[in-house]
Design a protein with these regions (language model features):
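Phosphate-binding P-loop
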Residues: 1-3
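Short hydrophobic/aromatic beta-strand immediately N-terminal to the Walker A/P-loop
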Residues: 5-7
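P-loop (Walker A) phosphate-binding loop of NTP-binding proteins
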Residues: 11
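Conserved lysine of the Walker
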Residues: 16
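Hydrophobic positions on the alpha1 helix immediately C-terminal to the Walker A/P-loop
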Residues: 19, 23
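Short, structured coil segments at secondary-structure junctions
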Residues: 27-29, 121-122
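Conserved nucleotide-sensing/catalytic segment adjacent to the nucleotide-binding pocket
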Residues: 28, 32-35, 41-89
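ATP-dependent NMP and nucleoside kinases share a basic, alpha-helical "lid"
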Residues: 92-161
């Protein structure tokens, strides 16, 4: 299965989740979104007080090797069990989410473009810089109707599926 992998990165509050939701809505059932946050490393060995003080905005906080492995499996047509991060306990939960391959896969996170392994598996890389988000969405919504936007995406990236 050919999978279009889109990486969307930017600081907290930059608008990356807004862009991710916008793209996911346009692709409909053909898209799966994976959040890099779900790949924070397990911290069962630390107390809650220690976990609260943890710096979560650095590469060492993430199990990026597992995310890279999962991307390879999805690109190979295999399903994965994605970890689920629980913000209330500042740790991974015991739950996992079964994710099946879809024609479009969006990876959303603050540092998804930082890791070379991940970048090399992405077909499209979108670094989000906050000050450009609102003007871009205003122009897109004024200038490009959704049908034309989908057509442009298909032309630029190849038709999913």
């Amino acid at each position: 299965m050919d999978i279009l992998v889109i990486g969307i990165a930017g600081g907290s509050g930059s608008g990356k989740s807004t862009i991710t939701q916008w793209l996911a809505k346009r692709f409909g059932d053909d898209v799966t979104v994976i959040r890099h946050d779900d790949y924070y490393k397990e911290q069962h060995d630390k107390t809650y007080a220690e976990r609260v003080k943890q710096n979560y905005d650095c590469p060492e906080a993430f199990d990026t090797a597992l995310l890279a492995e999962h991307l390879m499996k999805l690109r190979a047509g295999e399903s994965i069990e994605c970890p689920v991060y629980d913000y209330t306990i500042h740790d991974r939960s015991d739950k996992v989410t079964l994710i099946k391959p879809t024609p479009v896969l969006i990876i959303d996170g603050i540092l998804v473009l930082q890791d070379e392994r991940l970048r090399n598996m992405m077909d499209i890389k979108i670094p989000v810089i906050y000050r450009y988000i609102n003007p871009i969405f205003i122009l897109i919504s004024i200038k490009l109707p959704p049908v034309l936007m989908a057509s442009l995406f298909s032309t630029a990236c190849g038709k999913p599926g």
